[in-house]
């Protein structure tokens, strides 16, 4: 079986390193630190400036290959159910993670979210079952589709959706989505395994991490 590319190599570890000198972590440079983390000769806990939540997020991302499900590379779309899914009892201002409705994308995203106790909503937009990278290529993930998907899913008591987090491949939709909705929109990482790093203290790891 040919495995789908989950873009683990696109995780931007450098972005989340402490602003201090990486030599405090036992490496000669920050690039050397990342190499050491990836080959296992260094550990996130070697960095005294990294807070506990970031140590856990680094450890998680570094182990993503063994955590994520094996997904086959299919040429044809495999549509799953679109719609809004709630994780960990979200409240009115809990962020909404936007994704596509590929069955395999849904499996990967929900696997990652199984490792947090933080509240989120996930909006699986009907993009004909394309994975997000293909949905942007084929223009099946659009501002209008996201807007229509959200139209009937307003969080109770909030009056409006406060914050959307787009997948990294959908960066070009950020500005037009803000202009159309007036909502707060952020562009998240390309690889979903980077979410714990990207969200920082807003991502609380489940027990054991």
Briefly describe each language-model feature range:
Residues 1-4, 20, 24-178, 182-209:
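Conserved mixed alpha/beta catalytic, RNA-binding, or beta-rich assembly cores of soluble enzyme
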Residues 7-23:
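Immediate flanking context of iron-sulfur cluster ligation sites
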